Protein backbone atom coordinates (compact mmCIF):
# COMPACT_ATOMS: atom_id res chain seq x y z
CA UNK A 1 0.00 0.00 0.00
CA UNK A 2 1.24 3.48 -0.89
CA UNK A 3 2.14 5.62 2.12
CA UNK A 4 0.54 8.96 1.25
CA UNK A 5 1.12 12.31 2.94
CA UNK A 6 -2.53 12.41 4.00
CA UNK A 7 -2.18 9.01 5.69
CA UNK A 8 0.91 10.19 7.56
CA UNK A 9 -0.94 13.37 8.57
CA UNK A 10 -3.92 11.38 9.84
CA UNK A 11 -1.71 9.13 11.94
CA UNK A 12 0.20 12.12 13.29
CA UNK A 13 -3.03 13.85 14.36
CA UNK A 14 -4.27 10.65 15.92
CA UNK A 15 -1.14 9.85 17.91
CA UNK A 16 0.74 13.12 18.25
CA UNK A 17 3.95 11.39 17.18
CA UNK A 18 6.47 13.02 14.83
CA UNK A 19 6.05 12.92 11.06
CA UNK A 20 9.05 10.63 10.43
CA UNK A 21 7.94 8.26 13.21
CA UNK A 22 4.45 8.09 11.69
CA UNK A 23 5.83 7.36 8.23
CA UNK A 24 8.07 4.62 9.61
CA UNK A 25 5.15 3.11 11.53
CA UNK A 26 3.03 2.99 8.38
CA UNK A 27 5.85 1.42 6.36
CA UNK A 28 6.43 -1.19 9.07
CA UNK A 29 2.72 -2.04 9.10
CA UNK A 30 1.97 -1.96 5.36
CA UNK A 31 -0.12 1.18 5.58
CA UNK A 32 -2.53 -0.20 8.22
CA UNK A 33 -3.23 2.91 10.29
CA UNK A 34 -4.63 1.01 13.28
CA UNK A 35 -1.64 -1.32 13.39
CA UNK A 36 0.68 1.68 12.93
CA UNK A 37 -0.97 3.47 15.87
CA UNK A 38 -0.48 0.37 18.01
CA UNK A 39 3.13 0.12 16.81
CA UNK A 40 3.72 3.73 17.87
CA UNK A 41 2.13 3.05 21.25
CA UNK A 42 4.49 0.15 21.79
CA UNK A 43 7.38 2.32 20.66
CA UNK A 44 6.23 4.98 23.09
CA UNK A 45 6.22 2.46 25.92
CA UNK A 46 9.80 1.52 25.09
CA UNK A 47 10.83 5.15 25.23
CA UNK A 48 9.00 5.55 28.52
CA UNK A 49 10.98 2.66 30.00
CA UNK A 50 14.28 4.32 29.04
CA UNK A 51 13.25 7.52 30.80
CA UNK A 52 11.76 5.91 33.90
CA UNK A 53 14.86 6.41 36.07
CA UNK A 54 15.04 10.16 35.53
CA UNK A 55 13.95 12.44 38.36
CA UNK A 56 10.64 14.15 37.62
CA UNK A 57 10.41 17.03 40.12
CA UNK A 58 8.68 19.75 38.10
CA UNK A 59 5.11 19.55 36.90
CA UNK A 60 1.62 20.71 37.70
CA UNK A 61 -1.20 20.38 40.18
CA UNK A 62 -4.59 19.95 38.50
CA UNK A 63 -8.09 19.77 39.95
CA UNK A 64 -11.53 18.58 38.96
CA UNK A 65 -14.77 19.04 40.87
CA UNK A 66 -18.44 18.15 40.73
CA UNK A 67 -20.41 19.57 43.66
CA UNK A 68 -19.03 18.24 46.94
CA UNK A 69 -16.72 15.82 45.17
CA UNK A 70 -13.27 17.19 44.29
CA UNK A 71 -9.80 15.89 43.53
CA UNK A 72 -6.25 17.18 43.25
CA UNK A 73 -3.59 15.38 41.24
CA UNK A 74 0.13 16.02 40.99
CA UNK A 75 1.69 15.13 37.65
CA UNK A 76 5.47 15.55 37.42
CA UNK A 77 7.83 16.26 34.55
CA UNK A 78 11.61 16.62 34.53
CA UNK A 79 11.68 20.28 33.49
CA UNK A 80 9.56 23.38 33.86
CA UNK A 81 9.67 23.74 30.07
CA UNK A 82 7.73 20.50 29.56
CA UNK A 83 5.41 21.42 32.45
CA UNK A 84 4.16 24.23 30.20
CA UNK A 85 3.85 22.05 27.09
CA UNK A 86 0.30 21.77 25.72
CA UNK A 87 0.53 17.96 25.54
CA UNK A 88 1.56 17.79 29.19
CA UNK A 89 -1.12 20.27 30.29
CA UNK A 90 -3.81 18.34 28.42
CA UNK A 91 -2.62 15.13 30.09
CA UNK A 92 -2.92 16.65 33.58
CA UNK A 93 -6.53 17.60 32.84
CA UNK A 94 -7.25 14.09 31.59
CA UNK A 95 -5.75 12.64 34.78
CA UNK A 96 -7.75 14.99 37.04
CA UNK A 97 -11.05 14.23 35.32
CA UNK A 98 -10.36 10.50 35.29
CA UNK A 99 -9.61 10.66 39.02
CA UNK A 100 -12.85 12.53 39.70
CA UNK A 101 -14.92 10.00 37.78
CA UNK A 102 -13.26 6.97 39.36
CA UNK A 103 -13.03 5.57 42.87
CA UNK A 104 -9.21 5.38 42.75
CA UNK A 105 -7.88 6.01 46.23
CA UNK A 106 -4.34 6.96 45.22
CA UNK A 107 -2.03 7.53 42.26
CA UNK A 108 -1.11 3.85 42.02
CA UNK A 109 -4.75 2.81 41.65
CA UNK A 110 -5.29 5.62 39.15
CA UNK A 111 -2.79 4.08 36.71
CA UNK A 112 -5.22 1.32 35.72
CA UNK A 113 -8.27 3.59 35.31
CA UNK A 114 -9.55 3.43 31.74
CA UNK A 115 -10.27 6.49 29.62
CA UNK A 116 -13.05 6.85 27.06
CA UNK A 117 -10.46 6.04 24.38
CA UNK A 118 -9.98 2.59 25.92
CA UNK A 119 -6.47 3.44 27.12
CA UNK A 120 -5.48 3.32 30.75
CA UNK A 121 -3.92 6.36 32.42
CA UNK A 122 -0.60 4.50 32.40
CA UNK A 123 -0.83 3.88 28.65
CA UNK A 124 -1.70 7.52 27.99
CA UNK A 125 1.24 8.58 30.17
CA UNK A 126 3.60 6.51 28.04
CA UNK A 127 2.18 8.02 24.87
CA UNK A 128 2.71 11.56 26.19
CA UNK A 129 6.27 10.66 27.22
CA UNK A 130 6.90 9.70 23.60
CA UNK A 131 5.69 13.15 22.53
CA UNK A 132 7.49 15.34 25.05
CA UNK A 133 10.67 13.30 25.50
CA UNK A 134 10.76 13.40 29.30
CA UNK A 135 9.90 11.10 32.15
CA UNK A 136 6.44 11.90 33.52
CA UNK A 137 4.91 10.61 36.73
CA UNK A 138 1.38 10.69 38.12
CA UNK A 139 2.64 11.05 41.66
CA UNK A 140 -0.22 11.91 44.00
CA UNK A 141 -4.00 11.95 44.21
CA UNK A 142 -6.09 13.33 47.06
CA UNK A 143 -9.85 13.72 47.20
CA UNK A 144 -12.74 15.00 49.29
CA UNK A 145 -16.30 13.73 48.82
CA UNK A 146 -18.78 15.40 51.15
CA UNK A 147 -22.24 16.90 51.51
CA UNK A 148 -20.58 19.95 53.11
CA UNK A 149 -19.16 22.94 51.22
CA UNK A 150 -16.08 21.81 49.29
CA UNK A 151 -13.74 24.27 47.59
CA UNK A 152 -10.88 23.48 45.22
CA UNK A 153 -8.19 26.06 44.54
CA UNK A 154 -5.03 25.86 42.43
CA UNK A 155 -2.47 28.66 42.48
CA UNK A 156 -0.37 28.99 39.35
CA UNK A 157 -0.50 25.27 38.71
CA UNK A 158 2.05 24.80 41.51
CA UNK A 159 -0.04 24.59 44.68
CA UNK A 160 -3.46 23.01 45.08
CA UNK A 161 -5.86 22.92 48.03
CA UNK A 162 -9.14 21.18 48.83
CA UNK A 163 -11.18 22.39 51.81
CA UNK A 164 -14.24 20.90 53.47
CA UNK A 165 -16.30 23.48 55.36
CA UNK A 166 -19.36 22.66 57.45
CA UNK A 167 -21.71 25.65 57.37
CA UNK A 168 -20.82 29.01 55.87
CA UNK A 169 -20.76 29.13 52.08
CA UNK A 170 -18.59 28.19 49.13
CA UNK A 171 -17.11 31.70 48.96
CA UNK A 172 -15.75 31.36 52.50
CA UNK A 173 -14.50 27.85 51.73
CA UNK A 174 -12.63 29.20 48.71
CA UNK A 175 -11.13 32.01 50.80
CA UNK A 176 -9.91 29.45 53.34
CA UNK A 177 -8.41 27.40 50.49
CA UNK A 178 -6.52 30.46 49.24
CA UNK A 179 -5.22 31.06 52.78
CA UNK A 180 -3.99 27.46 53.08
CA UNK A 181 -2.25 27.73 49.71
CA UNK A 182 -0.41 30.84 50.90
CA UNK A 183 0.37 29.94 54.52
CA UNK A 184 0.65 26.13 54.48
CA UNK A 185 -0.58 25.39 58.03
CA UNK A 186 0.18 21.80 59.10
CA UNK A 187 -2.94 21.52 61.29
CA UNK A 188 -6.50 22.87 61.49
CA UNK A 189 -6.73 23.68 65.21
CA UNK A 190 -4.72 23.51 68.43
CA UNK A 191 -6.20 20.15 69.44
CA UNK A 192 -4.72 18.64 66.26
CA UNK A 193 -1.14 19.55 67.20
CA UNK A 194 0.73 16.45 68.49
CA UNK A 195 1.59 16.46 72.19
CA UNK A 196 5.15 15.46 71.28
CA UNK A 197 5.55 18.66 69.26
CA UNK A 198 4.30 20.81 72.15
CA UNK A 199 6.58 19.04 74.65
CA UNK A 200 9.60 19.52 72.39
CA UNK A 201 8.84 23.22 71.91
CA UNK A 202 8.52 23.68 75.68
CA UNK A 203 11.91 22.05 76.11
CA UNK A 204 13.42 24.37 73.51
CA UNK A 205 11.86 27.50 74.99
CA UNK A 206 13.05 26.57 78.47
CA UNK A 207 16.60 26.02 77.18
CA UNK A 208 16.55 29.45 75.53
CA UNK A 209 15.55 31.26 78.74
CA UNK A 210 18.07 33.19 80.78
CA UNK A 211 19.12 31.94 84.21
CA UNK A 212 17.34 34.96 85.68
CA UNK A 213 14.01 33.95 84.13
CA UNK A 214 14.50 30.32 85.13
CA UNK A 215 14.88 31.44 88.75
CA UNK A 216 11.38 32.96 88.78
CA UNK A 217 8.54 31.25 90.70
CA UNK A 218 7.16 28.14 88.99
CA UNK A 219 3.74 29.68 88.27
CA UNK A 220 5.35 32.73 86.62
CA UNK A 221 7.70 30.52 84.63
CA UNK A 222 4.75 28.41 83.47
CA UNK A 223 2.90 31.52 82.28
CA UNK A 224 5.91 32.70 80.30
CA UNK A 225 6.38 29.29 78.66
CA UNK A 226 2.64 28.90 77.99
CA UNK A 227 2.54 32.28 76.27
CA UNK A 228 5.40 31.33 73.98
CA UNK A 229 3.88 27.91 73.20
CA UNK A 230 0.50 29.48 72.46
CA UNK A 231 2.15 31.73 69.89
CA UNK A 232 3.94 28.78 68.28
CA UNK A 233 0.74 26.71 68.14
CA UNK A 234 -1.07 29.60 66.47
CA UNK A 235 1.65 29.71 63.83
CA UNK A 236 1.24 26.03 62.93
CA UNK A 237 -2.57 25.90 62.93
CA UNK A 238 -5.02 27.20 60.36
CA UNK A 239 -7.33 28.58 63.03
CA UNK A 240 -4.55 30.45 64.82
CA UNK A 241 -3.19 32.27 61.77
CA UNK A 242 -4.25 35.80 60.71
CA UNK A 243 -6.66 35.37 57.79
CA UNK A 244 -4.90 36.45 54.59
CA UNK A 245 -8.09 37.99 53.18
CA UNK A 246 -8.64 40.02 56.36
CA UNK A 247 -5.63 40.19 58.67
CA UNK A 248 -7.66 41.97 61.37
CA UNK A 249 -9.06 38.58 62.34
CA UNK A 250 -7.80 35.03 62.61
CA UNK A 251 -9.10 32.28 60.37
CA UNK A 252 -10.97 30.87 63.35
CA UNK A 253 -12.71 34.19 63.94
CA UNK A 254 -13.70 34.43 60.27
CA UNK A 255 -15.02 30.87 60.27
CA UNK A 256 -16.91 31.16 63.57
CA UNK A 257 -18.46 34.48 62.51
CA UNK A 258 -20.08 32.57 59.64
CA UNK A 259 -21.27 29.82 61.97
CA UNK A 260 -18.97 27.39 60.21
CA UNK A 261 -16.23 24.89 60.97
CA UNK A 262 -13.34 23.57 58.87
CA UNK A 263 -13.65 19.78 58.82
CA UNK A 264 -10.39 19.23 56.98
CA UNK A 265 -8.18 20.10 54.04
CA UNK A 266 -5.67 18.67 51.60
CA UNK A 267 -2.73 20.62 50.17
CA UNK A 268 -0.31 19.59 47.42
CA UNK A 269 2.70 21.49 46.09
CA UNK A 270 4.63 20.43 43.01
CA UNK A 271 7.76 18.44 43.80
CA UNK A 272 7.55 18.62 47.59
CA UNK A 273 9.56 15.79 49.09
CA UNK A 274 11.40 15.01 45.85
CA UNK A 275 15.16 15.36 45.92
CA UNK A 276 16.17 17.21 42.77
CA UNK A 277 19.35 16.25 40.97
CA UNK A 278 21.79 19.16 40.79
CA UNK A 279 24.00 18.78 37.75
CA UNK A 280 27.64 19.84 38.05
CA UNK A 281 28.56 19.98 34.38
CA UNK A 282 32.09 21.27 35.04
CA UNK A 283 32.85 18.28 37.26
CA UNK A 284 31.27 15.92 34.73
CA UNK A 285 33.44 17.24 31.89
CA UNK A 286 36.58 17.05 34.04
CA UNK A 287 35.74 13.47 34.99
CA UNK A 288 35.29 12.48 31.36
CA UNK A 289 38.61 14.14 30.51
CA UNK A 290 40.36 12.23 33.28
CA UNK A 291 41.08 15.41 35.24
CA UNK A 292 39.05 14.55 38.31
UniProtKB/Swiss-Prot annotation:
Region feature Involved in Mg(2+) ion dislocation from EF-Tu, mapped onto this chain: 79-82
SUPFAM superfamilies registered for this protein in UniProt: Elongation factor Ts (EF-Ts), dimerisation domain, UBA-like
Cellular compartments per GO CC: cytoplasm
Compartments, record wording: Cytoplasm
Keyword Cytoplasm: yes
Keyword field contains Cytoplasm: yes
CDD domains listed in its UniProt record: UBA_EF-Ts
Chief place of localization: cytoplasm
Keywords for this protein: Cytoplasm, Elongation factor, Protein biosynthesis
GO MF entries: translation elongation factor activity
Entry similarity comment: Belongs to the EF-Ts family.
Known role: Associates with the EF-Tu.GDP complex and induces the exchange of GDP to GTP. It remains bound to the aminoacyl-tRNA.EF-Tu.GTP complex up to the GTP hydrolysis stage on the ribosome.
Name of the protein in its database record: Elongation factor Ts
Organism whose genome encodes this protein: Xanthomonas euvesicatoria pv. vesicatoria (strain 85-10)
Amino acid sequence: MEITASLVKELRERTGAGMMECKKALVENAGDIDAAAEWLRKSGLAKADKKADRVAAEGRIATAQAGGKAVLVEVNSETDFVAKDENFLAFTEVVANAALNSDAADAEALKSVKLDSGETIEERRAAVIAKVGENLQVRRLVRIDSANNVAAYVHGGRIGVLVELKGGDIELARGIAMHIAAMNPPHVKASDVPAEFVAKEKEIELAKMSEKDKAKPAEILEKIISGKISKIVNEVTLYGQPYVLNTDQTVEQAVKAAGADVIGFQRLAVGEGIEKVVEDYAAEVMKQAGLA
